[in-house]
Swiss-Prot record:
Record's keyword terms, sorted: Amino-acid biosynthesis, Aromatic amino acid biosynthesis, FAD, Flavoprotein, FMN, Lyase, NADP
Cofactor: FMNH2
Cofactor note: Reduced FMN (FMNH(2)).
Stated name of the protein: Chorismate synthase
Enzyme Commission identifier(s): 4.2.3.5
GO-annotated cellular components: cytosol
Example GO BP: chorismate biosynthetic process
Enzyme class: lyase
Organism, scientific name: Desulfosudis oleivorans (strain DSM 6200 / JCM 39069 / Hxd3) (Desulfococcus oleovorans)
Catalytic reactions on record: 5-O-(1-carboxyvinyl)-3-phosphoshikimate = chorismate + phosphate
GO MF annotations in UniProt: chorismate synthase activity; FMN binding
Subunit structure comment from the entry: Homotetramer.
Family: Belongs to the chorismate synthase family.
Length: 354
């Protein structure tokens, strides 16, 4: 199975399945001397772990305690591969026994079977969101590397269930269960999720990620453009179905005079480019958005087929999120951190004489 590794110089490989013994990541290419311990990684992981307190989140309880098995000595990275893992403690495979022979609508069951001829039906196996543990653990390492260069990355809920934030105050993100920067829409979001949950259905939304302090010059034309890699990173997350940078799709309806970010001695007058021009960072804030689809595991009865192609109906009763938001927010943040850390190292490799 290819496609488990991401990055060029700062490379990460995730491993593990939803109901296997454990999950984790191997990070290769992290420079030596970086301060790193399990507590620091855990702080970021706690934002994505199951049972995090939101009414939109799964009832599955996983501590997801990070264990660093290699690549760190006396609190510093050694430059060798870093392995971070956690054990799966609360997997209940019996919840999937009755539907093991059915293809779940909206899931990768049917496509994994088509590709490999075999699939792990316990919670989606490798296609489960449990895989994102490794992404976030690696993102925590990347975030520390970026911090040393004055770069910070933050993600928040821009929209949930069709209800959109009207103002952005990142100081409010950690103050509510949905990770939303606008407290005035919290009641509406709560009502929306509650109603959908009562029906046994699910909702999607939009996550916005911003990166500040990114220097001009990151990105490798033409096929490794910074925005292309950010788009790939976000699209690689299972629930993400669309990505835009800066003005994004709105730019298609603009005139050139409105779309262009005029340049002044103090910098850019606007940021429709989202901090990236010609695939290279321009020194402005990087802004990306990810469209997150509704969780496909729902209690409402739907039509499907079994593994023999015969018609069947299915209603999924396991412990599932009502929305991937807000748990997916930190996954989006982590993926942008990985891209920026990789491109930062790539830029340093060609500019060390300057």
């Amino acid at each position: 199975m290819a496609g488990n590794t991401f990055g060029e110089l700062f490379r990460v490989t995730t491993w593990g399945e939803s109901h296997g013994p454990g999950i984790g990541v191997v990070i290769d290419g992290c420079p030596p001397g970086l301060a790193l311990d399990e507590a620091g990684v855990q702080k970021m992981l706690d934002r994505r772990k199951p049972g995090g307190g939101s009414i939109a989140s799964t009832a599955r309880k996983e501590a997801d305690r990070a264990v660093i098995l290699s690549g760190v000595f006396e609190g510093k990275t050694t430059g060798t591969p870093i392995l971070i893992m956690a054990h799966n403690r609360d997997a209940r495979s019996s919840a999937y026994t009755d539907i093991a022979g059915l293809f779940r609508p909206g899931h990768g069951d049917i496509t994994y079977t088509a590709k490999y001829g075999i699939r792990d039906w316990r919670g989606g196996g490798r296609a489960s969101a449990r895989e994102t543990f490794g992404r976030v653990a690696a993102g925590a390492v990347a975030a520390e590397l970026l911090r040393l260069s004055g770069i910070s990355v933050a993600a928040y809920t821009l929209e949930l269930g069709g209800i959109r934030a009207t103002t952005i105050d990142v100081g409010q993100v950690d103050q509510n269960m949905f990770g939303c920067p606008d407290s005035t829409v919290m009641a509406a979001m709560t009502d929306r999720v509650t109603q959908v949950k009562r029906r046994g259905d699910s909702v999607g939304g939009i996550v916005e990620v911003r990166a500040d302090g990114v220097p001009a010059g990151l990105g490798e034309p033409v096929f490794d453009k910074l925005d292309a890699d950010i788009a790939k990173a976000l699209m690689s997350i299972g629930a993400v179905k669309g990505v835009e940078i800066g003005a994004g799709f709105e730019a298609s309806g603009m005139t050139g005079s409105r779309s262009n970010d005029e340049i002044t001695p103090q910098g850019f007058a606007t940021n429709n480019a989202g901090g990236i021009l010609a695939g290279i960072s321009n020194g402005d804030r990087i802004v990306a958005r990810a469209a997150v689809k509704p969780i496909p595991s729902i209690g409402i009865t739907q039509q499907t087929v079994d593994t023999n192609g015969k018609p069947a109906s299915i209603s999924i009763k396991g412990r599932h999120d009502i929305s991937a938001i807000p748990r997916i927010n930190v996954v989006c943040e982590a993926m942008v951190c990985l891209v920026l850390a990789d491109h930062l190292l790539r830029q340093k490799a060609i500019s060390w004489t300057r």
